[in-house]
Amino acid sequence: MIERIYLAKPRGFCAGVVMAIQAVEKAAVREDKPVTVYHSIVHNHTVVERLSEGGRVHFVEDLDAVDALPDSGDTVIFSAHGISPAVRERARSLGLSTIDATCPLVTKVHTEAKKYAREGYTILLIGDSAGHQEVIGTRGEAPENTILVGVLGKTGPGLNDPHAVQVPDPERLVVLTQTTLSVDDTRKTVDILKARFPALVVPPSEDLCYATKNRQDAVKNIAPNVDAFLVLTSTHSSNGMRLLELAEAECGRAYRLETAADLTRLEQNGDLGGVRSVGITSAASTPDDLVQDVVAHFRALNPALEVIEEGEWENIEFREPKKIAPTQELPRTMQ
């Protein structure tokens, strides 16, 4: 029986996710017709389902599909993961007004990519998947200058091994990263590249976002106190899956949930056998009510359950993105 739960702080929604979700919610109320979101606004099924309720928000993976949507309006919202200039230009050519809900910390990486490309650098972009929306968007800012490098331990189509990647000019080289990677694995990957290419430029401010680091640190702090870890995340959430990997490495037993309903499977499989204390965290795109549902499940089994919250909440807010008409000049940071 679970006697004690340690809830990680921080966990769940980060400032970028809150900004993006609120942008969709406000646009759905403000616009005369339903709004369209390009890609999942954040990588969480529950969030997408809740926003879709009522028919005021549609989600597409291709902007050309907007016209085919019922009662489609002319406003499209870009997801928190960022988009390439090609997608932005396609929206403009289709006459769509846009609301860019890209996380400002992702936009910062885009800005760095454009800067270094203009200066003639080759960009080594560290990521965990060539198909991740954030990687696609960042690479799209400077496709001719960018080489994808798999973060340590990650392989796949389009990802180069940091031990073997080849570059055209080792003297004009900079490293940028996806924002949601393992802090430890990213540091090791950069160290490998720096050892191979001594002239490699590492930007002074880390690309990994504060929320990624803080959530990983919270897992490390709790792990010594628990028998097992539960991580609420979608498999599509990069930061959430990195939390799962970290929890398993630090604790030895870690399980992924999307909702409290998944606990039935764990209990039937005997996965929580012998577990008396459990740590719980959640991806930056996971609503906290899903975490509280898990706590309620265990409390129903043990009314004397002790719940301890470890760590501190963040106090960061991002400005609401503005709507841009298709004929309107883009802000300088988007050019």
UniProtKB/Swiss-Prot annotation:
InterPro entries: LytB/IspH. The active site is at 134 (proton donor). Keywords: 4Fe-4S, Iron, Iron-sulfur, Isoprene biosynthesis, Metal-binding, Oxidoreductase. [4Fe-4S] cluster binds at residues 14, 103, 209. (2E)-4-hydroxy-3-methylbut-2-enyl diphosphate binds at residues 43, 81, 132, 179, 237-239, 285. Isopentenyl diphosphate binds at residues 43, 81, 132, 237-239, 285. It catalyses: isopentenyl diphosphate + 2 oxidized [2Fe-2S]-[ferredoxin] + H2O = (2E)-4-hydroxy-3-methylbut-2-enyl diphosphate + 2 reduced [2Fe-2S]-[ferredoxin] + 2 H(+); dimethylallyl diphosphate + 2 oxidized [2Fe-2S]-[ferredoxin] + H2O = (2E)-4-hydroxy-3-methylbut-2-enyl diphosphate + 2 reduced [2Fe-2S]-[ferredoxin] + 2 H(+). GO terms for cellular component: cytosol. One of its GO terms (biological process) is isopentenyl diphosphate biosynthetic process, methylerythritol 4-phosphate pathway. Pathway: Isoprenoid biosynthesis; dimethylallyl diphosphate biosynthesis; dimethylallyl diphosphate from (2E)-4-hydroxy-3-methylbutenyl diphosphate: step 1/1; Isoprenoid biosynthesis; isopentenyl diphosphate biosynthesis via DXP pathway; isopentenyl diphosphate from 1-deoxy-D-xylulose 5-phosphate: step 6/6. Pfam families: LYTB (PF02401). GO terms for molecular function: 4 iron, 4 sulfur cluster binding; 4-hydroxy-3-methylbut-2-enyl diphosphate reductase activity; metal ion binding. Dimethylallyl diphosphate binds at residues 43, 81, 132, 237-239, 285. It comes from the Bacteria. Its EC number is 1.17.7.4. The keyword Ligase does not apply. Its cofactor is [4Fe-4S] cluster. Binds 1 [4Fe-4S] cluster per subunit. Catalyzes the conversion of 1-hydroxy-2-methyl-2-(E)-butenyl 4-diphosphate (HMBPP) into a mixture of isopentenyl diphosphate (IPP) and dimethylallyl diphosphate (DMAPP). Acts in the terminal step of the DOXP/MEP pathway for isoprenoid precursor biosynthesis. Belongs to the IspH family. This is 4-hydroxy-3-methylbut-2-enyl diphosphate reductase. It comes from Deinococcus radiodurans (strain ATCC 13939 / DSM 20539 / JCM 16871 / CCUG 27074 / LMG 4051 / NBRC 15346 / NCIMB 9279 / VKM B-1422 / R1). The gene is ispH.
